[in-house]
Amino acid sequence: EKPYPGPAGDIADIADTAFDAEVAAAPREAFPRSHRAAITAETPTLLIFTSGTTGLPKAARYSHMRWLSSGDVMEVTVEATPDDVFYCFLPLYHGAAATSVTSTALRAGAAIALRRKFSTREFWKDVRSHGITVCQYIGEICRYLMNQPASPDDRQHGLRCMMGAGLTPEIWQRWIERFGSVQIFEGW
């Protein structure tokens, strides 16, 4: 990993040198129309794996239109701009990471800071050092963060909104009291 000077300091660049060279050498013209002629709004663009609550996880098809629509809706909802930095600590095969985070950030022209896995110990450090402004949470993430010892720096951050599902009203209220006026978009 090597540092990449992002909008608020260094952000880990997970690409290796060979990949960097491939990207630099890639053609800049539009992808040939003949290669995309059969792609429609309904054509699957990615597979999202279910949680496996009724058996083994299953691959669910996600269309181009649905992915693009996710970004359109959430861009307006969270008022995303190119100045935002989205924080993604979820695996990219997870629906929230593959849709809400990526499509919204790309639609807005915003950056995405990736972490290999969620860390309660590193969360606020990452938010502060990388200028994170928008975060996608799931389930108990906010409760895990609330269970960390209070710090005088709890309100010293640029996180302006979080979007996700599974936040209880009690944790939601305690979250705002402790970490300040972070706008929460709870939904499914």
Each PLM stretch: what is its role?
Residues 1, 58-61, 88-89, 110-117, ...:
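Short beta-strand->loop structural element characteristic of the AMP-binding/adenylate-forming
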Residues 26-49, 56, 79-85:
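Conserved pre-ATP/AMP-binding loop-to-beta segment of ANL
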Residues 36, 121-124, 173:
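Short hydrophobic/charged patches on amphipathic alpha-helices used for structural packing
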Residues 1-41:
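ANL superfamily adenylate-forming
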Residues 68-85, 93-133, 148:
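Conserved AMP-binding/adenylation subdomain of ANL enzymes
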Residues 107, 129-137, 146-188:
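Gly/Ser/Thr-rich phosphate-binding loop
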Residues 44, 50-53, 86, 92, ...:
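Conserved S/T- and glycine-rich ATP-binding loop of Class I adenylate-forming
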